[in-house]
Amino acid sequence: MAMTTTASGLSYEDTRAGTGASPQQGQTCVMHYTGWLWENGAKGAKFDSSLDRGKPFNFPLGQGRVIKGWDEGVASMQIGGQRTLLIPPKLGYGERGAGGVIPPNATLLFEVELLEVR
């Protein structure tokens, strides 16, 4: 992967450029996503996917409703775009992990698609 790494430590790569507007703080982002654990430099176990449920996920951008890596990684996307996010623990679930599915200090890999902004 030819990823761009930001000052915070988030890495991302656009797999399909969007053509619509980028979301603004407070707007609702409607997404499809799949998340995997990143283990030993490779995609590990899948832990969640909106595609598997057949229902997009939505959240207000920049309001702390999702992990920091999502708020940062989605902010510069455009509607219709697809992006791979590689999220270090400090921008993910950190030392606490999540729900017995994501271990403490896990690096996460997400494939996300910005479907709509409202």
Residue ranges and their predicted role:
Residues 1-118:
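Cross-family detector of peptidyl-prolyl cis-trans isomerase
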